[in-house]
Amino acid sequence: MAIGGNKTGKKKITQRKNPDPYLKKEWYPVIAPAHFKSRHIGQTPVTKTAGLRVATDVINHRVYEVNLGDLNPGAEDLNGNTKFYLQTQLVSDGKCLTNFHGMDITRHKYGSLFRKGCDCIDVFMDIPTTDGYLLRVFVIAFTDRFRFQRRKNCHVKGRVIRMMRAGIYETLHNELGKVSIPVLVTKLSNFEVNAKLTEALQKITMCRDVMIRRVKVVKRPRNTMELLSTMHDSNQVRNLAEGQSIQQ
């Protein structure tokens, strides 16, 4: 047979196209608690229910990081530098109802606080709420120069730092130690505790940038369904906040 006479060439290998993974997904809207002005956070994807794998079980306990500037749109600078962590607790009527899971400030805001020639006071305290939560609250504060001060630095003595720490502990205990979690979230979102901390420390020495920089949920109660319904009812949240202000 002549060379090249075999016309049976190699078969073409056709590559199998991978299907789009998002064709098997469904989207659930995420709803924030009633303490915030803009409650619709966005949507979260989850694989559709198939066999023993239920979509609502997979989506439970998901944690979302949301900027406070999106939850409470406004002109306040600190809103855009604060993050809230919200966790899915229940999927009802195709919506993910979330609950408070923590708070933090952004990394660039935290890095911009530090300057030369001042003292940094960093304090944390475990605070139990009236409805069974245990929160770890971190507070940061910096000393500042007095008016018409010639010295460039503003370092203070150890006894002044101890007095500042004691003032922070006392203010946190008075403001957050005897409240429920809905009232606590309201106080964190409108920076009411930051103003109280600044007022308490200004009586001791000059200070700046006194704020709660982080809140961590250490322990939560087992049965939170009743509390979740309270946090997503705007009327009940408003009544709790008004009742707390009247008591104070």
From Swiss-Prot:
One of its GO terms (cellular component) is cytosolic small ribosomal subunit. One of its GO terms (biological process) is translation. GO terms for molecular function: structural constituent of ribosome. It holds the Pfam family Ribosomal_S3Ae. Coiled coil: none annotated. It comes from the Eukaryota. Keywords: Cytoplasm, Ribonucleoprotein, Ribosomal protein. InterPro entries: Ribosomal_eS1, Ribosomal_eS1_euk. It is found in: Cytoplasm. Component of the small ribosomal subunit. Mature ribosomes consist of a small (40S) and a large (60S) subunit. The 40S subunit contains about 33 different proteins and 1 molecule of RNA (18S). The 60S subunit contains about 49 different proteins and 3 molecules of RNA (25S, 5.8S and 5S). This is Small ribosomal subunit protein eS1. It comes from Giardia intestinalis (strain ATCC 50803 / WB clone C6).
